[in-house]
């Protein structure tokens, strides 16, 4: 059990540190942006930007760790035993058929959303069937997905930092309802981005940086997915993570009270961009006086 807990806690620590470092570098870069380089901050405002900013990033990393946590909690042989295995397979097959042949919320969204949802569910159902009927495939599947999810985490952190930089250059703030609007008008936004930025070189750069960071930080962890089998470590890590996540949610919300000063840039720099995106999505409004 100790080896499993060491693996999980080590992953959380590395992802959190990477998130905080990325946030620190981003804040320093944004401070030298043309919109903020001439501003003078008081000592208290510097503390808000960097100390509260690091705390907000840690909270966001804790919440974001939930996707990897769910995957690790799902690594088990129990789901391949009768009758659970056939129940799960039936649910996945039914979900695939429903999304593929019926009118669903994905059809309301339009674009390629229905095809993407159908493809994901079909892939999930098909691969679960392979794991169910071919036992030797299970360990390989878990190892590959474990490594892939960790790589995606690193890529998401790098991609988000670069995206926030360009968004700040355009609007002088963290993500807001304009960023949410980008998701609605995806085709138009993608077209504008392709015309305005060197997307291919940037994408290749993000991929290279992601792979280098993943290999440097996680190369000893990527092949350890078999440690995740078992329930004892989950009985300890599960409640601990839920408590940490709830605390992180509360702290992120609590810290917003420090983001209402007269200096808009201090408010924005100390905030976490992903939480600002979530907040804008929930509130569904834009501060027109600010813009």
Question: Predicted regions span which residues?
Answer:
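Transmembrane and membrane-interface helices of multi-pass
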Residues: 3-287
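Basic, amphipathic N-terminal segments that precede the first structured/catalytic domain
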Residues: 289-291
């Amino acid at each position: 059990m100790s080896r499993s807990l060491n693996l999980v806690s080590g992953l959380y620590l590395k992802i959190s540190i990477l998130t905080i470092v990325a946030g620190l570098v981003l804040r320093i870069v944004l401070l030298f942006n043309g919109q903020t380089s001439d501003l003078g901050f008081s000592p208290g405002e510097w503390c808000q930007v960097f100390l509260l900013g690091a705390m907000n990033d840690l909270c966001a990393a804790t919440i974001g760790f939930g996707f990897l946590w769910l995957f690790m909690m799902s690594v088990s042989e129990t789901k391949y035993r009768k009758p659970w295995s056939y129940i799960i397979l039936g649910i996945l097959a039914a979900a695939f058929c429903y999304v593929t042949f019926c009118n669903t919320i994905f059809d309301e969204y339009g674009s390629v959303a229905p095809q993407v949802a159908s493809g994901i569910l079909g892939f999930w159902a098909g691969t679960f069937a392979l794991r169910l009927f071919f036992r030797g495939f299970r360990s390989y599947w878990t190892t590959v997905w474990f490594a892939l999810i960790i790589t995606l985490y690193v890529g998401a952190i790098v991609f988000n930092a670069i995206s926030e930089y360009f968004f700040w250059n355009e609007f002088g703030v963290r993500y807001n309802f304009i960023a949410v609007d980008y998701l609605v008008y995806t085709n138009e936004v993608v077209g504008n981005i392709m015309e305005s930025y060197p997307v291919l070189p940037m994408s290749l750069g993000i991929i290279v940086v992601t792979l280098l960071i993943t290999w440097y930080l996680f190369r000893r962890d990527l092949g350890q997915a078999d440690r995740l089998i078992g329930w004892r470590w989950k009985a300890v890590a599960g409640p601990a993570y839920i408590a940490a996540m709830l605390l992180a949610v509360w702290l992120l919300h609590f810290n917003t009270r420090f983001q209402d000063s007269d200096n808009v840039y201090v408010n924005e720099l100390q905030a976490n961009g992903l939480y600002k995106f979530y907040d804008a999505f929930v509130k569904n409004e834009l501060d027109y006086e600010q813009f």
